[in-house]
Each structure stands twice: as C-alpha cells, then as structure tokens.
Amino acid sequence: MASEINLFYFEKFIPHQPNIIFQGDAVVTSKGKLRLTKTEDGEPVYQSVGRALHITPVHIWDSKKTKVANFFTAFSFTIHAPDVNKTADGLAFFLAPPDDKPKQGGGYLGLFNEGEKAPVVAVEFDTFINKNRDIDDPNPLHIGLNFMSIKSRATVPWVFENDSEAVVFISYDGSSKALDATLVYNNTTYFSLPTQVVDLRDALPDWVRVGFSAATGQSDPEFVETHDVNFWLFASCYKDDPATLAKTLTGINPDLA
C-alpha cells in the first residue's frame, strides 16, 4: 500500500529555482514571480510557450490500482494583457508523465499537439475562444477541465480581470474521484467548475509531475499576455482527504483560510 506524502510551498520564486523544472520560455522575474511566457522589454510576445513543473514526482495511484491519492493545491496567478480585447491564450495547472515535454502553443497551451489524445489532466484558465475543431471552445472565456484532450470535458464561464490576482483552489478526492476547482478575485468574486467525477487511473501513469503551462497567441502578434504565478502550495497523500490537506496548507499560509 502506497504511503507517499508530497508537500511543498513556494511563497515566492527565485531565479533558477531549485526543485523546479523550467521548460520553454518559463523564467523567474526579479520580483519573484514565475513567468511562464516570454516578454521583451517588459511586454509579452506571441508564439511563446512555457511550463514549470515540480521536480519531485507524485505517486498518484498505487501499483495495484487499488487506491488513488488525494491532492489539494492552491496558487495565485496574474495575467497582464496590453489590450484586454486581444487576450490569448491562457494558462493551466496540470498533471502529466514525469518525462512529458512542451507541446503545441496557442490554444493547445503547451499541453497537447493537434489531434492528440495524451496522458494529461489539466484545469485550464482560457483567455481566447478558439473554434479550432480540436479545441472547440465555448463562449465566453472559461475555466475548463482537460482530460486527455485539449477539448474541455467541462467548463464554467469566467469573467477575466486584467492585472488582478486570481487565487485558485483545486482538490481531488481519490475515493470519490471528485475534482473541484475554484478561482477567486479579491475574496469576493468566485468562479467554480462543477464537481467532476474522473478516475485519474484512466488518464495518467502511477507517477506524475505537477506544474503549470501557458501560451500566447500563435498567429497574430497583438494577441498576447503575460502569465505570472505568484505563489504555489501543493499536498498529496493517500491517508488524508482533500479537506484535511487544505487545512494543512492554510496552516502554512493563513491568508488562504
């Protein structure tokens, strides 16, 4: 029976942050933010993809497939778009095989290639309505669950606030297979994805890495934005349920309570 416990907290980030794998254009800014996509002279550029993953793999289900881990994560991000009417393309928190590499940019968010089914589970924060047949985004901008596909399995409308810090809570109960995700602005405006029942064993290998991926527009240089992660907490184990893990993490950062 697996008993692994993973727990980490980044109150802020430092350049060449230990325990973080940087992929693509991801860097840490001088202000301690994890910036996933590229900037030039402080402004975002198009055709950028960046990802950042924690170096320690997570044992998401045991080798006998009899038990699935619980996890809880909290983080905040800020997106800056020079033109709020030309945002693209968004960012995501994701779980993927330990050796996973960046994929296609634009609406694929660095997580998938065109026409691909892949062992990736993600919660996306989508800032561009892409009607590509693969993606088929709903109107309006949204939070979505990606389960082995860039086409969201479920979505909830999201009113994006430019330059505002969004705090996100994502939990997964390995017993009930329930995944929940909520985004909050200023402790007052909430956007919650309807609870999704998904068995991670159907999509992922038993060991995964967790992290973030983001992309800017692929074809028009005006559809750009920055994607900054401000802090990140994560905990997973087989014994404690997501509510208990959440209490553990709010003990680390009382501002999340």
What are the language-model segments listed below?
Residues 1-257:
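Polar, low-complexity loop segments and adjacent catalytic/binding residues used for recognizing
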